[in-house]
Structures are given as C-alpha cells and as structure tokens.
Amino acid sequence: MAAAGRRGLLLLFVLWMMVTVILPASGEGGWKQNGLGIAAAVMEEERCTVERRAHITYSEFMQHYAFLKPVILQGLTDNSKFRALCSRENLLASFGDNIVRLSTANTYSYQKVDLPFQEYVEQLLQPQDPASLGNDTLYFFGDNNFTEWASLFQHYSPPPFRLLGTTPAYSFGIAGAGSGVPFHWHGPGFSEVIYGRKRWFLYPPEKTPEFHPNKTTLAWLLEIYPSLALSARPLECTIQAGEVLYFPDRWWHATLNLDTSVFISTFLG
C-alpha cells in the first residue's frame, strides 16, 4: 500500500508539472491556475454525503444541525461585492505590501512565517507538491490583521445563524491547488468558499480518524482513504464558490483545495 501510494504521488506530481497553466481572470477572479492538474488527478467525491439546504430557517438549523451534524448552506447571504474585492488583481492592489503571517499546513501548525502578501501570491501560491509534508508547506489562513484588512472584511456578510454564548471571529485564507489542512478539531463554525473549490472530510467527535499529523490531506486521500471500509469513511463533500459549510463543535475535519481557493471562515468561539 505504501509503495502504491508513493507511485500515485509521483504520477500526480508529473501530471501537475506537465499540465498546470495559469488561466485568464474571467469568472475565477484571476486565481484559476490548474489546467488539468489536480482536477484531473484528484476529483470531487463520487457522492456528496453532507446535506445541502437552500434558504433554511434558523429554527430548522438549530433543530437539525447546530449540535448534530454538518450541513451545506446555500442562498443565505449575497457576497458578490466581497467576491469582487477578493479577485487577485484587487487584493494585490489593496494589500500587496501588507505583511501576512503564514502557518504550516499540518495538524498543529506550530511554525509561523511573515512575508509580504504579494510575495506569497506570486512566489508561494503554487500547486502543492504531492510528495511534500504538511509541516513543510506554508499556508495563508487565519492570523489576519483585522485593522489592516478592515476595508475588505467590512463587506463580508457572514451566515446569519449564531449559537447562544458564542462570538463570531473571521479567518480569511488563500491556498494553492492540492493544499489543505489534515484532520483536526475545534469549536463550531462556518466556512465559505469565495473562489475555487474545497473538498471536506468530516468525522463526529467520537470517531477519531486514522492520519499522520505531519502528512498532507492529499497524501491521506491517496494512501489511507482507498483502504477504508465504506462504514469507516468520513462524511465528505466539495464546497463550491458561494456555498457555506457548517461544522458542529469538536467535529474532526480535513480540507483539500481542488483549485487555488479563496475562503473565509466564521468561528463561533
């Protein structure tokens, strides 16, 4: 299994290097960067196992999902202005010189690196090398300077649902195709995709997944996932641009960006 996994990683890397191209801005805000790339080698799941709900009421949310299971929410907010502001061109023009803090893309994310946002976008925001470790991969997510980025965040409309006794906190991120964060857990929250696609894998609190904290989600998907019995597989779904995933308190989750992705989470702490 390990040898097969390594061969799969090598093949995926070769495919990436051969076919990755940068596409014009169009409807992807200038972030589209994966001709065939990861879309050809690691696709969306065969069947989404997380419910999608459009125009759900607060009462329905609290009764069926808030403390029980994840759900994908559609049509609750209009973030078209925020999306336009998050285009590659607009973000570089507004925040290119700002210093951003990067974290390693592993479960514990101990290492932090500070550098200009433009340098991250132009030099580090590349498709993930499938053979690299999570603790060697730098990832822009969280650690946002809300004072410097206030002109952007003030235009975001978060999901309108709240849990009693919690306070919302934003976490904004941009990551390359094939990147992601391996399994971890924390409090409840919402995660919205602005550009790109993000594949999620989720387990309930009592079901600890098999994973290595320093290996990437991509490595887990290629090496561990195929050997899982159907009963041992996680809930999974690919979140499209404009959709919001809600995850309850202490649910294990891992993410995999299928494209260069721009996203924002609202954590309920």
From Swiss-Prot:
Modifications the protein undergoes after translation, according to the UniProt entry: N-glycosylated.
GO cellular component, one term: endoplasmic reticulum
Record function comment: Functions as a positive regulator of TNF-induced NF-kappaB signaling. Regulates angiogenesis and cellular metabolism through interaction with PKM.
InterPro entries noted in UniProt: Cupin_8, JmjC_dom, JMJD6_ArgDemeth/LysHydrox
Subunit and interaction comment: Oligomer. Dimer. Interacts with PKM; regulates angiogenesis and metabolism.
Induction per the UniProt record: Up-regulated upon endothelial differentiation.
GO terms (BP aspect): cellular respiration; positive regulation of canonical NF-kappaB signal transduction; positive regulation of sprouting angiogenesis; regulation of glycolytic process; regulation of pyruvate kinase activity; sprouting angiogenesis
Record note on disruption phenotype: Homozygote knockout Jmjd8 show no obvious phenotype. However, the number of capillaries in muscle tissue is significantly reduced.
Species whose genome carries this gene: Mus musculus
Residue intervals of the JmjC domain: 136-269
Glycan attachment positions: 135, 145, 214
Protein name: JmjC domain-containing protein 8
Keyword terms, alphabetized: Cytoplasm, Endoplasmic reticulum, Glycoprotein, Signal
First-listed, main subcellular location of the protein, grouped into a coarse class: endoplasmic reticulum
Region forming the signal peptide: 1-24
Subcellular location: Endoplasmic reticulum lumen; Cytoplasm
PANTHER family linked to this entry: ARGININE DEMETHYLASE AND LYSYL-HYDROXYLASE JMJD (PTHR12480), JMJC DOMAIN-CONTAINING PROTEIN 8 (PTHR12480:SF21)
Residue ranges of coiled coil: none
